[in-house]
Amino acid sequence: MATTSFSLPNHKFGIKLMLFLVLNLLSLQTSVFAHSSNSKFTKISRHPNSDSSSRTKPSTSSNKGFLSSVQLSLDHALFARSLAFNLTLSHRTSQTLMLDPVNDCLELLDDTLDMLYRIVVIKRKDHVNDDVHTWLSAALTNQETCKQSLSEKSSFNKEGIAIDSFARNLTGLLTNSLDMFVSDKQKSSSSSNLTGGRKLLSDHDFPTWVSSSDRKLLEASVEELRPHAVVAADGSGTHMSVAEALASLEKGSGRSVIHLTAGTYKENLNIPSKQKNVMLVGDGKGKTVIVGSRSNRGGWNTYQSATVAAMGDGFIARDITFVNSAGPNSEQAVALRVGSDRSVVYRCSIDGYQDSLYTLSKRQFYRETDITGTVDFIFGNSAVVFQSCNLVSRKGSSDQNYVTAQGRSDPNQNTGISIHNCRITGSTKTYLGRPWKQYSRTVVMQSFIDGSIHPSGWSPWSSNFALKTLYYGEFGNSGPGSSVSGRVSWAGYHPALTLTEAQGFTVSGFIDGNSWLPSTGVVFDSGLL
């Protein structure tokens, strides 16, 4: 991965800000931990509705202490980022294997800095609880991911150890900030728009920040699009590779559209966090194909193995097939990794074996998309809803597969996997999921489940790990594999969610989709069917 430079939206970290952060570090530590000692940070309930997002403004009670806590996290993230960046400069000609996870941490720290900056410095009036909750949850996930990338290398030098230490310290600070936020968060949640109903694109649905020209663009068919770039392998477009087209996009806040004409593109692509609102439009599943073959067995860590990685907020993919062709014996091999907030994948295909789709972080929505794999082929720690998708377990090197491995590491994170009105099928014995992290959260609702799913439904990760703290649930499913009579009896498993509980995992209740999905032009069901 190329080293990225951190830039703030419409701002740059200058020398004065650097000095300001340094001078404030010790005083912030004192004020934050004094606040911590006088506060009881109660964990939110495992009940899904207790952390369903409300569209209210953040609470002003204890706001100063909370912002000081986030500022302290921002300071530490900046120091860690500086350390990682300096390490890449001093070791560019050596220790290239060690630099892979360092570059991962560098990119993740850039993303974290951007989110924390928005909370502390910008403090825009339209930032609501769901935004702040999402950013803090994602920032915490970023540090967990950095540590995971570092751990996948068998050894690294003292600088790498220092980065790992910074990541662990930052994890603690972010956990504290998240605790403070949730304890102060208003508990009221809107009950409107939870009764279901298909939501279609209409003019009044667009938020004020979507321009009229963008609305017309997002409503348009491929033939009507006026893309900023056209990729064609035969040279008939503006570019012959997707990477060239991405590099040609001008910086700005508007939507950038790239049309990928029918063909197979053998590339590994990274859309960094600073490249926002990118829309990739193909000519259809199986017609426009992006394929890579990186894998853990081939020397790439999980994060870097992705054929396509989208970190910039507002990412949209439509009518494209994403493939990792590494094969069933290659261990972790990601076809698509998404860490983009308010992202949409529509009418696409994601094809791999182990770890096909990495839903890394933030709010995501998948509609009418086929996802194929073997072990943990949907994993990560985003807040994600799958609707009208085909989840297909294929034959691999093992005799049993797992559809999901959700990675929620803190009970205050507003993350999880919601599979709604989908088809789950397979050609080998398969489990709906297993807990990758302590507070793993996954629900399957109003979906068809075929006979490939094991009667127990869910599998442990290792022994009794997370069986009491996970949250797994089912609601209104059908098909030969949908019976809950033989399911696991774990404390964290809910065989029959109530109507109210299930509503908490819908598009409107879980990812606040009514506020942003209309602007994308995608059809979606806001509530239960």
Curated annotation (Swiss-Prot):
Domain of life: Eukaryota
Glycosylation sites recorded in the entry for this protein: 86, 169, 193
Major subcellular location class: secreted
Binding, substrate: 302, 332, 434, 436
Biased composition (Low complexity): 50-64
Residue span of region Disordered: 42-64
Free-text tissue specificity from the UniProt record: Expressed in siliques.
Pathway terms, separated by semicolons: Glycan metabolism; pectin degradation; 2-dehydro-3-deoxy-D-gluconate from pectin: step 1/5
GO biological process: cell wall modification; pectin catabolic process
Gene3D superfamilies in the record: Invertase/pectin methylesterase inhibitor family protein, Single-stranded right-handed beta-helix, Pectin lyase-like
EC number in record: 3.1.1.11
GO molecular function: enzyme inhibitor activity; pectinesterase activity
Alphabetical keyword list: Aspartyl esterase, Cell wall, Cell wall biogenesis/degradation, Glycoprotein, Hydrolase, Secreted, Signal
GO CC aspect terms: extracellular region
Other notes: The PMEI region may act as an autoinhibitory domain and prevent untimely PME activity during transport.
Identification of the protein by name: Probable pectinesterase/pectinesterase inhibitor 35
